[in-house]
Amino acid sequence: MFEKINYQRRRFLGIAGMTIATTQLGRFGSANAQSSQAKPKESVTPQPGALQSTDPAAIRPFHINIPQADLNDLRQRITATRWSEKETVADSSQGVQLTTMQELARYWATDYDWRKVETKLKALPHFITQIDGLDIHFIHVRSQHENALPLIVTHGWPGSIIEQLKIIDPLTNPTAHGANASDAFHVVIPSMPGYGFSGKPTSTGWGPERMGRAWDVLMKRLGYTRYVAQGGDWG
């Protein structure tokens, strides 16, 4: 049975997501991606010191480096938001209430710590590869347990891979969390097209079926011929 979608939550997150999108946090495209030739193993991942590859289908290491100037510019633009008039009703029937959005903007401009999040992201192995003409960014963490099951996890809308950071260690290292080695997974978490550090589609058509095919290409490119998939919300 499909999980019932909370449309009120979606409306709220949608507006919040669009606000973030217009500010283009850190201009994700400025993150630096480097490429290397993958050495075939059970799972194909770049090896340190490997030769650079010009093949867009190669699995390339991806390094996050958001300039401080971009963060400062983002905060300034959030602070300079010109707000519309207050809604004419006391409930959310006309959308997210103005006071809620203003409080969110205040938090983003003054309290939100991108560097803290960036540090968590940098602690994980990031990669990028081109699939169907689009750069796809993903996290790939292999379990040290034998016979771990490959798992690809897809975030929802609006959302990002940050939602899945907390599940990586319990899935890849279950014995450290009171579970059995037989519960282990090799975890792959891609950013959907147009999200995070993945490329932005320039045409329509990137629906669930096309993304599903792209994810299959990704898993096979990583050397996984047998895997399971998980998604939440619209993931």
Regions found by a protein language model. Name each.
Residues I20-A21, W108-Y112, V117-G235:
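Catalytic cores of eukaryotic secretory-pathway lumenal/extracellular enzymes that build
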Residues T79-H126:
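An N-terminal hydrophobic leader/cap segment in hydrolases
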Residues F2-I20:
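N-terminal secretory signal peptides and thylakoid transit peptides that target proteins
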